């Protein structure tokens, strides 16, 4: 006795909206946050999928650049300094996150041109 009545079909295995969209970020959780956040009275079915995809893309982009920064510094672990270097050296990410302060991120190395030693004719020879 399965409780499905006469000739009822077995229910298909549940598949998350994240896996249907081919995403790692949780679509269901994003949908819940959109509903609970009082952003709008109603939330469409596609909105959380799109938002989760955008957030996943941005996270992947930042982690890729931060991983490169860590490798350049001969480190195997990404730390806040690597995130800072990755974001500030990328023009578009820097513009997007211009108002963001990363704790323990430090600053970009920069020396004003007027402070550098002057090149003389003797030094050139």
Swiss-Prot record:
The modification N5-methylglutamine is found at residue 104. The keyword 4Fe-4S does not apply. It comes from the Eukaryota. It is found in: Nucleus; Chromosome. Transmembrane segments: none annotated. The modification N-acetylserine is found at residue 2. GO terms for cellular component: nucleosome; nucleus. Residues 1-21 are annotated as: Disordered. The modification Phosphoserine is found at residue 2. The keyword Protein transport does not apply. Keywords: Acetylation, Chromosome, DNA-binding, Methylation, Nucleosome core, Nucleus, Phosphoprotein. Residues 1-18 have a biased composition (Basic residues). Gene3D superfamilies: Histone, subunit A. One of its GO terms (molecular function) is structural constituent of chromatin. Its main location: nucleus. Core component of nucleosome. Nucleosomes wrap and compact DNA into chromatin, limiting DNA accessibility to the cellular machineries which require DNA as a template. Histones thereby play a central role in transcription regulation, DNA repair, DNA replication and chromosomal stability. DNA accessibility is regulated via a complex set of post-translational modifications of histones, also called histone code, and nucleosome remodeling. Belongs to the histone H2A family. The nucleosome is a histone octamer containing two molecules each of H2A, H2B, H3 and H4 assembled in one H3-H4 heterotetramer and two H2A-H2B heterodimers. The octamer wraps approximately 147 bp of DNA. This is Histone H2A. The lineage of its organism: Eukaryota, Metazoa, Echinodermata, Eleutherozoa, Asterozoa.
